[in-house]
Amino acid sequence: IHFFYLGLCLLTLTSSAAAGPETLCGAELVDALQFVCGDRGFYFSKPTGYGSSSRRLHHKGIVDECCFQSCDLRRLEMYCAPIKPPKSARSVRAQRHTDMPKAQKEVHLKNTSRGNTGNRNYRM
């Protein structure tokens, strides 16, 4: 059933270019946004920074632009959420500290908690 909606959205969007202005409202608009944006998700109003300030005064959101008026794929894409950058790997410094074997951590903690500040190294 989901593929049916995607096909319907694609058909609606491609036929609108050939047949003239077409509007998307309600579930059709949501399905079209899901199709265009995919896993990124979407906004019903443009995030700050899109378009000029005069345009923001006239248009309140995607319903104004695509339901009350016709819109194209580029207009729909403007409401997609940005692509999230991949999470960076942990720093090497953090890995060294957290990857220390438990026995060495305990000895290290014991030495620092007793106030042993001399050049003595306790190893197991």
Curated annotation (Swiss-Prot):
The reply on keyword Secreted is: yes
The answer to whether the entry has keyword Secreted is yes
**From the Swiss-Prot or TrEMBL record, what is one GO molecular function term?**
insulin-like growth factor receptor binding
* Record region (B): 20-48
Q: Which UniProt keywords apply?
A: Disulfide bond, Growth factor, Secreted
Q: Which ranges are annotated Basic and acidic residues under compositional bias?
A: 96-109
Organism superkingdom: Eukaryota
Start and end residues of each stretch annotated as D: 82-89
Where are the stretches annotated A?
A: 61-81
Q: What would be one Gene Ontology cellular-component term for the protein?
A: extracellular space
- PANTHER family per UniProt: INSULIN-LIKE GROWTH FACTOR I
Tell me what this protein is called: Insulin-like growth factor 1
